[in-house]
Amino acid sequence: MEEKYGGDARPGPGGGLGPVDVPSARLTRYILLLCLTKCLKAVGLFESYDLLKAVHIVQFIFILKLGTAFFMVLFQKPFSSGKPITKHQWIKIFKHAVAGCIISLLWFFGLTLCGPLRTLLLFEHSDIVVISLLSVLFTSSGGGPAKTRGAAFFIIAVICLLLFDNDDLMAKMAEHPEGHHDSALTHMLYTAIAFLGVADHKGGVLLLVLALCCKVGFHTASRKLSIDVGGAKRLQALSQLVSVFLLCPWVIVLSVTTESKVESWFSLIMPFTTVIFFVMILDFYMDSVCSVKMDVSKCARYGSFPIFISALLFGNFWTHPITDQLRAMNRAAHQESTEHVLSGGVVVSAVFFILSANILSSPSKRGQKGTLIGYSPEGTPLYHFMGDAFQHSSQSVPRFIKDSLKQVLEESDSRQIFYFLCLNLLFTFVELFYGVLTNSLGLISDGFHMLFDCSALVMGLFAALMSRWKATRIFSYGYGRIEILSGFINGLFLIVIAFFVFMESVARLIDPPELDTNMLTPVSVGGLIVNLIGICAFSHAHSHGHGASQGNCHSDHGHSHHAHGHGHDHGHSHGFTGGGMNANMRGVFLHVLADTLGSIGVIVSTVLIEQFGWFIADPLCSLFIAVLIFLSVIPLIKDACQVLLLRLPPDHEKELHIALEKIQKIEGLISYRDPHFWRHSASIVAGTIHIQVTSEVLEQRIVQQVTGILKDAGVNNLTIQVEKEAYFQHMSGLSTGFHDVLAMTKQMESLKYCKDGTYIM
C-alpha cells in the first residue's frame, strides 16, 4: 500500500495519478533504463556546453525548443486528442512557456559559467530532494534527524563548490568571451554577477542554485495545469510550441544584428539532434514512465547516482583524445582544454551531493507503523511503536539557531563564552584576511592557531548549553556532568599543547633559528588585547575553581546487631550550594590564559631579538610558557578526575562528618550504614544512606530530620532507605544465611544503648 499510493501526483499517460504495482523483474528493467537515460543526458549536456561556445544562448534554446516541439507535437498530437483548450487555459499555457524559457535561460547560462560537470551536480536534482531540503530549512516538520543530515550534506556540497573548487578559468580572464557580450541580455546577467563581487564560475553556482529552486517551483505549479489540459505530455508539447513562437522574434533580431560564429549550420545538425533527444525528449519521457511504474522517491534515488557518476567520468575524460570518437562535434585530437577541470573540491562536493540526494529522497517512515500488543481494561487498543516514533519533531534550521542563541544569551557562563568566541573569530578572520593580502605565512599560521583555540571555546559553549538540558528517562541525573567532561578534555588538550611546545622549544634551544620579526609585534599585541578581555571575563571561573570533587563516604565499624526491619523512603533536596567547581569555565579560562602567555612570550622574545639579537630568547620563552601551561592545568585535571571517580567533596568533608555524628543522636534511630556522598556537578552534591530505626518510630519524622541535617551539610540530592526489624525477619524467612545478614549489618553505626538502657548486641 505504501508503494502503491506514496508516489508523486504527476499524471500518467492516461491521466491517472500515482505509481502502479510492477513485478520486480520489470521494475529492474525500468531502473536500468532510467540509469541509461541519465547517463545519456550527461552526454547531451556536455555536448551542449561545446555548442554554446559557437552558438548564442538564445539561438541555442530556440533550436532545442523547436526540435522538442516538432517531435512532441508529431507524436502527442495535442490538437487532435483530448478536450479542446479554452482561452483561459491558453493564457496559462503562455505563462507556463514564459516561465520555462526563463528557467532554460538561467540553466544554460549557468552551464556556460560553470561547465557541464558542475551544472549536472547542481541542477540535476529531483523535485522531492529539493522539497525535502526546503522543508528541513524552513518548516518545523522536516522529517527527522536523517533529513536534517541530508540537508546539511547538500549545503556542504554547495559550499565546497563555492570555496574549495579551483575552477578559476573564467576568473583569470581579463574580459569575458566575445560571444557572450553580443546581446543586452547576457551583458545584463554578467553585470548582475559582477555586482555580487564573485568570480563568474562562483556566480554560476549561485545562479544554478536559483534556477534549481525555480525549476522545482515551476514543476509544482504545473501539476494542476497539466491535469486541466489533459496530461503532462500534452502540456509539455503545447508549452514547447508556444516557447518557439515566443523566441522566434528574438532570434530573428539577433541574427540580423549580430555576427554569427558558426561557419556551417549543417555541421551542427547531428550535435543538436543529440542534445534534443538526450536532454529534452528521452529524459522527459523516461521520468514520466518511471514516476508511474514506481515510487517517485525510488526514481530520485536511482536517477541521481548514475548522472552524478557520469558527470565525474565525463568531466575527467571529455576533453581527452580517446573520447573524440564518442563526440558529435569535430575537434582535433591534440586539442585539449583546461576549462572547468576536475578538482578535489568538486569531487568532495559530488560525494556530498550523492549522499544528500539518497537521504533526502528516502521516504520518511517515522511513526508510520505500530504493533498491536493488546487492549486496555476499557477496550482501547494498545500499540507498540519502534524507532523514530519516539523522536521529537525536528525544528527548522533558522528556528533551531534562534532558540539556541536565546539559550546561549540567557545564562552568564554561556553568554560570556559566546561573546568572547565572536571576538576571537573576528580577530582570527581579520588576521587571515590580512595574511592573505600581504602574503604573510606567519599571520596565516597564527590565524589557524587562533581558529584551533576557537574550537575549545565552541566545545565549552556546547557544554554550557547541554548542562541545562532537562533530565530524561535515559539520563535521569540530567547533563550537568557535561561541564566536567568538557573541562577534563580541555585540560588534556592543553597538556598535549604544552608537551609539543616543550619538545619544539628544546629542539630550538640546541639550534636557535633566525626569525622574521616584522609582523610578530603587531599580531602579538592584537592577540594580547583580545586575550586580556577574555582573562577579565573568565577570571571568576578560576577563582571559584578550588575544592570541587566528587567522592563517596562510608563507615565500617564491623558491629553485629539484632535483626532490624526494613522500610523504604527517599528524601530529595535540590537547592544550590556554593563552592562547586565549574570545570568547563576553568578549562576555557586556562585556554585563554595559555594564549595570553603565548602573546606575552612572543612580545618579550621579539623585543630581545630586535634589540640584542638573542634568537635563543624565542625557545626560552616558549619553554617557560609550556611549563606554566602544564602547571596551571594540573589542578583542573586533578579536580576533574576526582569528580569523575566520585570522591567525597573536599569542601563538604568536615560538614558531612559532623552531620553523621548528629544523625547518630536522633531519637529512634538505631544506626546507619552505607553512607555515600559525591559531587555530581557544580550545583549538585548527591548522597545515599541506609538508616535503621526502631519498630515504633514514625519513619517520615526520621527521614525529615536526616534530610535536614544532610542538607545543612551541603547534600542537595539525597536518597534515604529506612530499615526496620521486620525486614531482617523477612530475610531470615527467605532462608538468608547468617553471613548474608551479617553482611547487611556489618557497616552499621550503633549507639550501643537504646533510650531505655537496653544494650544492643
Curated annotation (Swiss-Prot):
Protein keywords: Acetylation, Antiport, Cytoplasmic vesicle, Golgi apparatus, Ion transport, Membrane, Metal-binding, Transmembrane, Transmembrane helix, Transport, Zinc, Zinc transport
Reaction catalyzed: Zn(2+)(in) + 2 H(+)(out) = Zn(2+)(out) + 2 H(+)(in)
Cytoplasmic compartment residues: 1-29, 76-96, 140-150, 213-236, 286-301, 362-416, 468-481, 540-588, 635-761
One Pfam family, short name: Cation_efflux
InterPro entries from the UniProt entry: Cation_efflux (IPR002524), Cation_efflux_TMD_sf (IPR027469), Msc2-like (IPR045316)
Annotated GO biological process: cobalt ion transport; GPI anchor biosynthetic process; insulin processing; intracellular zinc ion homeostasis; zinc ion import into Golgi lumen; zinc ion import into organelle; zinc ion transport
Post-translational modification: Could homodimerize through the formation of dityrosine bonds upon oxidative stress.
Region span, Disordered: 549-576
Gene3D superfamilies: Cation efflux protein transmembrane domain
Tissue: Ubiquitously expressed.
GO-annotated molecular function: metal ion binding; zinc ion transmembrane transporter activity; zinc:proton antiporter activity
Topological domains, Lumenal: 47-54, 118, 172-191, 258-264, 323-340, 438-446, 503-518, 610-613
Family, per entry: Belongs to the cation diffusion facilitator (CDF) transporter (TC 2.A.4) family. SLC30A subfamily.
This protein's name: Proton-coupled zinc antiporter SLC30A5
Organism from which the protein derives: Mus musculus
